[in-house]
Amino acid sequence: MRILVLSVTAFCLAIPLGLKAEDAGEPAARALWTVLQQGKVSADLRYRFETFEREGTPFTGDSYAPTLRIALGYETRSFHGFSAFVQGTAVLVIGPADYSIPTLPSQNRPDRPVISDPRGIQLSQGYLRWRRPVEGHRLTVALGRQEIMLNDGRFVSISSWRQIHQSFDAARLDVDVARQATFTYAFLNRCYRVVGHDATDGKFSLHAHLLNLAGQKSRRINVSLYGLLLDYRSVPKYGLSTRTLGVRATGPYEINPQWSVLYTAEFANQRDFGSNPNHVNANYYLAELGPGWRGFGFKAGYALLGGRSATDELTTPLANPFNGWTELFASNPNLGSSHGLEARYLTASGKLKPLDGATATVTYYDYHSDSNRIHYGSELDWALAYKVKRISNHWEIGSRFGCYWADRLYTHALRASVYTQFTL
C-alpha cells in the first residue's frame, strides 16, 4: 500500500514539475485535468460457469460457480513521459452457486471442491509509469500495484484464468540493453492473490527481487536468464523463502513458410533463502519438442519439479496452476516418502478451419513422483475458443475441460467450464 500511495503522490507532483516554460501561465490543476480527460478506458467482462467434481472424502457434492468478472481500467494520457493507470475488479455471482474457498470464511464449504473465484470488489491495479528513451534505448519505470508475469508464468504469474488476477505492490524497471535484449528488475513488496483480499491468505508481505534478461536472435530463438529471490515476512510462509536461478530458450525455429520446429528448453535451480529455516536444493526441468505446420502444433513435453522431502522440494507460490486444468497439481505433491512431480505430456493445438477465429487445444498428461517413481495418475484436457469476428473482434466464447484419473494420489476429478468474454 505504501508503494501505491507513493506512486499516486509522485504522479500528482509530476504534473506541475513537468510544465514547460511556455506552460508556466497555465495552472497545474488545468494541466492535470487535461491529462486525466484525454486518457483511455479499458474493460474486461467475462461470464463463466464452472463446475468441479471430485470423488471421495470429504466431498459430498459437486461445486458449481456462475461468476461474472467486471474489470474496468483507466490510463491517463502521457505527460512528459508520465502516465498513470488504475483498475478495479468486481466478481459477481449470477445464479445459484455452491462452491468452496477454504480460506474465505464466508465461502468455506469443506464438503465441496475448491473453485477460487470469490465474490467481491477490489482495487486490482494502480500505478504510475514513466517512459523515456535513453541514448536510443527504451526505459520504463512503474511504481504501484501492478500485474507482473515472468516468461510463461511458472514462477511469477497473474493467473489470468481466474476471475481475480494476482497483482503486486511493486517497483519495476524495464530497459532495452541491446537491439533485441531487455533487462527487467522488479522489487515486490506485497502480493494480492486470486482468492481475494478478504481471504486469510489473500495478501501477504514479502521482500522479493525479480531479475530477467530476455533476448531474441534471428527470430528463431528467444533466451531468458532469470533470477527470483523470495523472502517472506510472516512466519507461516518462511518455508517458501527461496532463491531461484534459471535459463529458458524457446522457438519456433522456422524451416520455411509452412513448417517449423516448436521447442522449449528450461532449467532452474532453487535454494533456501532469507528467512527459510529449511535446507532446499531442488531443480526444475522443462523440455518440449514437436513440428509446427500451417498454424497447427504438435509437441511432446517433459516437466520435472524436484523433491526429496516435504521441505526440500521446488515451490512456486507466485505461479499460476500448471500440469493440468483440474488444478490438482497447483503445488508440488507429497505422498508418504514420495515427493516432487514428473509430468510427461502430448499436446496438439491449431486453428479450426474454415471457422475463422476458432482454435482448439488437446493435452494428455501422465504423472509420477520425482522420488520413488510412484504413479500419480493421468489427465486429459481440451479447450475450444472462438473469436466472434463477424460481430466483434473483442468478443470471445469458449470452453475448457479437464478429466483426471487417479492412481496413488488424490481421487478422480472432473473440471469443466464455458465462458463468454468481451475485452476492450
Where are these regions (language model features)?
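Signature for the C-terminal beta-barrel architecture of outer-membrane proteins
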Residues: 22-25, 135-139, 158-311, 344-346, ...
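Outer-membrane pore/translocation modules
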Residues: 96-119, 307-340, 415
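Cleavable N-terminal export/targeting peptides
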Residues: 1-31
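Beta-barrel outer-membrane channel/assembly domains of diderm bacteria
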Residues: 21-141, 171, 175-176, 249-268, ...
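Extracytoplasmic loops and strand-loop junctions of Gram-negative outer membrane beta-barrel proteins
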Residues: 24-26, 53-58, 107-112, 153-156, ...
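Solvent-exposed loop/turn segments at secondary-structure junctions
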Residues: 91-93, 147-150, 192
